[in-house]
From Swiss-Prot:
Keywords: Cytoplasm, Methyltransferase, rRNA processing, S-adenosyl-L-methionine, Transferase. HAMAP family: 23SrRNA_methyltr_G (MF_01859). It comes from the Bacteria. This is Ribosomal RNA large subunit methyltransferase G. The keyword Metal-binding does not apply. Belongs to the methyltransferase superfamily. RlmG family. It is found in: Cytoplasm. The keyword S-adenosyl-L-methionine applies.
Amino acid sequence: MSQLELSNRMLTLHRFPQMREESPLQAWDAADEYLLNHLDNLPVNGPTLIFNDTFGALACALAGEGVWSISDSWLNQQATRQNLALNQLDEGDVRLLDSLAPLPGAPARVLIKVPKTLALLEKQLRALRAVVTPETQIVAAGKAKEIHTSTLQLFEKILGPTTTSLAWKKARLIYATFTQPELAESEVISRWPLDGTPWQIHNHANVFARGGLDIGARFFMQHLPDDIDGEIVDLGCGNGVIGLMALRQNPLAQVHFLDESYMAVASSRMNVELNCPDDLARCEFRVNNALAGYPSDRLHAVLCNPPFHQQNAVTDHIAWQMFRDARRCLQYGGELRIVGNRHLDYYHKMKKLFGNCTTVATHQKFVILRSVKMP
């Protein structure tokens, strides 16, 4: 289903990357509907800031009303552009900002889709303190089961008095009034030492495993290729620890750090600059949709810990896209090496795509697989 019915119009909305027509996943959720229904009764005169609008449903519904859409996701921004075009809406009616850009001042209305990461929500609320006024309407929305006491306490601590709505279709709204409560400063960027190295790893708020190295990455770091004289991609780089290790083990290689998260790519760049400054000239950092736009038959190795979630939905289509892109971009003899949860059965997917797949190492929970592009 791709039609969202609103009180004053019908919107056609698709996920990005676009799913097969038979997929049950849609480009909006009940929290979007609840929030838009609520706004029907709230006239506003001034700019609207929208945070974490997953596929642009809110931006499309409110386009033309002085809308700014702020997201950490390059894919979400592309989805917004796609859905504006699908609905014959002018892209200029919605101004897109990444998660690290300064916010416009004195918004009349702030709409927040509650993110999965509490650290990202805190970063966004702290940034809002500098621009909202007591007259700003502040409304957040999310799944009722994901709005916890800690979520409400965060709004209250940073912005001011906070209340919630009744649940509707398992969604809930949060209402906050800005009263500028006293607030201690907080570190925006977390940092921790990487065992076995002299490095300090720095993470922006929306980066996976913000407080320390996750088990899968730790396992993967022990089984990376070495002595490659060519181009290596850390695909879905996160904070860049895999790419950092690839730099160390492949002193003649060029390493590309790619992710669809602006904060991930910024974290990767920071970690190279602070830990391996002499290697910075061998690096490229890009916010991107997998390997879209990269030339074919060029890369020597692609290293990847593919995600199996997009927002709150479990899906393998992003992993499939990464694998297909890797096969296209690898030169003959180049390899795709991944780490993944054992239950995801990437072995058969990679063997089907490449014609070969070998197990490099196994762990109680994870497996490392390698496929080589053959003529």
